[in-house]
Amino acid sequence: MDPGAGSETSLTVNEQVIVMSGHETIRVLEVGVDAQLPAEEESKGLEGVAAEGSQSGDPAEASQAAGEAGPDNLGSSAEATVKSPPGIPPSPATAIATFSQAPSQPQASQTLTPLAVQAAPQVLTQENLATVLTGVMVPAGAVTQPLLIPISIAGQVAGQQGLAVWTIPTATVAALPGLTAASPTGGVFKPPLAGLQAAAVLNTALPAPVQAAAPVQASSTAQPRPPAQPQTLFQTQPLLQTTPAILPQPTAATAAAPTPKPVDTPPQITVQPAGFAFSPGIISAASLGGQTQILGSLTTAPVITSAIPSMPGISSQILTNAQGQVIGTLPWVVNSASVAAPAPAQSLQVQAVTPQLLLNAQGQVIATLASSPLPPPVAVRKPSTPESPAKSEVQPIQPTPTVPQPAVVIASPAPAAKPSASAPIPITCSETPTVSQLVSKPHTPSLDEDGINLEEIREFAKNFKIRRLSLGLTQTQVGQALTATEGPAYSQSAICRFEKLDITPKSAQKLKPVLEKWLNEAELRNQEGQQNLMEFVGGEPSKKRKRRTSFTPQAIEALNAYFEKNPLPTGQEITEIAKELNYDREVVRVWFCNRRQTLKNTSKLNVFQIP
């Protein structure tokens, strides 16, 4: 930021960067909140510290000297210590930063945040999400709810990519003095003067000495900056907004085409009496291949720009790298449901979605994050889009930025035109409709096109069954008697279908007189006596069923052995097996038939079984 921008005392964040040269790398990067500092003095302070560090041979001593030189330039008390074991090169390690925050009250003298760094981490990687740098704003005696903002430090920093997470509680406006949004041209987000203190530690093995440029006031000797071009601290760029949730795929769903990149938009920040909510940002770190800039601009992805009282406040944030590729998603929290807030615009409806998918750089799902016990994910429909129900789109994850939206919008396809309820639905059947179908149809005349009285046939079938049962006759007995006298067309199956009216009108018309004549004669015989009825039906009673044959275990074993040798034996072989086992030949033949059928059924089942 140029000196002109740094002249705003109450809204400026001054950062003190201490850089070590030589074979060592950046040791400490302190971020403090202080009054304005002239660009010339800070530049001299940075250069002096860098020169002093380059002359020092011991990395620990140089870091200690740098830690002492930083607070002198700022005119306040702070302490920063670096613990580096001797003989250990600055390989990738875990950075541990501790912070202590003074009460957010106006003070004459600003105090810096004490910072303690252990070892020499190379970069904050995705695997070290636990190593995060947290700046806390806690007003005295206030109970706050944190606002988790996922931050992606992208770019190739020594061949790795870093992540950091800021935790900022949703305090009230009274505890957030100076929280404003700058003009759209500047695009600067200015935190309160005494409310936010944070630090970031980056270590990378570079072949040449590198000086770090602070995000607030960059001072570099290797790469001068034109004075007319101020460095923006927080730059807003619309990013890809895709809620990482499992959405119902419509039948006619089509993938949305990539949209052109829109122009930069100003930050969307909403300050409300009970809390504040602003869009999470993504930090872009420039490639350090010989460059002097460590941290670039902070771009925000507008996800929810206003507190919504009807939403529990759980959503997700997409993490991208410098190339715009999605590397992960994390949940972030806004105001709770109990916080009263004004109703949002009618066109903004956000539904919290869970679970969330964690993607890697290749777009593969590697994990899921369940942020809260919410109902299953549902698609949210914007009220402004019902006029185009023919479109049904699901926005895919794309590396190119697109226009941010409050939620994934799915316009349901138009329902198919339903036929009018009053219009009759004709029965289209490839076969001739049966009597039951014709009789059950409403508004069906009693006579069909052939002059057959369907109602009369239905009544006769019902009475025929009652009279048959009163005589104690079965359908099989009636079928056998009629088959013997009238032919095979009057079998037991024909009697069954006639009683159920599962027969065509013509067939029913043909069966009706024959059945009526036979039933009348059977009733006359029954009046003469049961014996006469049995003689008329076909006389002798049915034989008892043969007792089921039971095989001994030895016989079953022998039959299985024969079956394994030859599943289909000849008649002579069956006779020999029956004599050997002392069983009837017919019993052995039936056993082989049943065994083959069982094997066939088992094979069919195996075909459909899921491996």
UniProtKB/Swiss-Prot annotation:
Ranges for region Disordered: 62-93
DNA-binding region residue numbers: 544-603
Tissue expr: In the embryo, expressed exclusively in the developing brain, whereas in the adult its expression is restricted to brain, heart, skeletal muscle and lung. In the brain, the highest expression levels are found in specific cell layers of the cortex, the olfactory bulb, the hippocampus and the cerebellum.
A GO cellular component entry from the record: chromatin
Database matches in InterPro entries: HD, Homeodomain-like_sf, Lambda_DNA-bd_dom_sf, POU, POU_dom, POU_domain_TF
UniProt xrefs under CDD domains: homeodomain (cd00086)
Ranges where the POU-specific domain occurs: 449-523
Keyword Transcription regulation among record annotations: yes
PROSITE patterns: HOMEOBOX_2, POU_1, POU_2, POU_3
Compartments where located: Nucleus
GO biological process: brain development; heart development; muscle organ development; negative regulation of transcription by RNA polymerase II; regulation of transcription by RNA polymerase II
GO molecular function, one term: sequence-specific DNA binding
Keywords: DNA-binding, Homeobox, Nucleus, Transcription, Transcription regulation
UniProt keyword DNA-binding present: yes
Tree of life domain: Eukaryota
A Pfam family recorded for this sequence: Homeodomain
Function of the protein: Transcription factor that binds preferentially to a variant of the octamer motif (5'-ATGATAAT-3').
Family from the record: Belongs to the POU transcription factor family. Class-6 subfamily.
Listed name of the protein: POU domain, class 6, transcription factor 1
Species whose genome carries this gene: Homo sapiens
Chain's gene name: POU6F1
